[in-house]
Amino acid sequence: MSKDYEVFPLLLEMAKRGCLVAPRRLSRIEILKTLGLTPWRFKKLVEAAEEEGYIERRVHGRMVFYVVTERGRALLRRVYDDLKRTIDSSTFLTLRGYVVPGLGEGAIYMGIPRYVEAFKEVLGYEPYPGTLNIKLVDEDVYLRRALREKRVGFRIEGFRLDEGRESCGVTVYKAMIMANGVTVSGAALDIDKTKHGDEILELIAPVRLRDELRLKDGDKVEVVIPV
């Protein structure tokens, strides 16, 4: 496999210059400049690619033509698929944690009509009046902090309550919440002012998550957030 990735840049450059379609003459000087190769290194890579069956050299008099074989095309496709899979998976952030008892803060927010209306506007549904709390594994606490920097959530600003107190703002991240082989569409909350540390993530959904996901304290939960 290491040899595959050594010859891949050369193979890709040949493909870009038409060698996937038909045998082509190539400017060695241009390829050396593009790939930053020495003549000796270029010679070794061509030999390696030919030995592995990725390219063929066809000599006509003093002219040399190169063509990428079906085996070479398969290598290009394999690397492309690896890159696409890696890039596509990077459009989601997965946070892992374990169910812990809550402090009742979520129920307070869910009981304030203005918050409920804001959640309905952002999420398209009225959340169950309460949150599920999970304690993130250590490495995912840092991912949560990185999530804030991406600014991909929906912002609900704080406002003044009837009794004169100020409510705090909250950022809402749409999410898929998964546990015990069940997936529920919900959201993760990042509340501006909370008694919890960054290791505690509060989740909401249109249903009671403990019931829908058959959860008890200590159960593992995964939260997948588009970024």
Swiss-Prot record:
Gene3D superfamilies: Riboflavin kinase-like (2.40.30.30), Winged helix-like DNA-binding domain superfamily/Winged helix DNA-binding domain (1.10.10.10). Its cofactor is Mg(2+). One of its GO terms (biological process) is FMN biosynthetic process. It catalyses: riboflavin + CTP = CDP + FMN + H(+). Residues 93-227 are annotated as: Riboflavin kinase. Residues 1-92 are annotated as: H-T-H motif-like. One of its GO terms (molecular function) is riboflavin kinase activity. CDP binds at G102, L103, G104, E105, G106, A107, V207, R208, L209, R210. Its EC number is 2.7.1.161. Binds 1 Mg(2+) ion per subunit. Pfam families: CTP-dep_RFKase. FMN binds at T194, E202. Mg(2+) binds at T131, N133. Belongs to the archaeal riboflavin kinase family. PANTHER family: RIBOFLAVIN KINASE. Catalyzes the CTP-dependent phosphorylation of riboflavin (vitamin B2) to form flavin mononucleotide (FMN). This is Riboflavin kinase. It comes from Thermofilum pendens (strain DSM 2475 / Hrk 5). The gene is ribK.
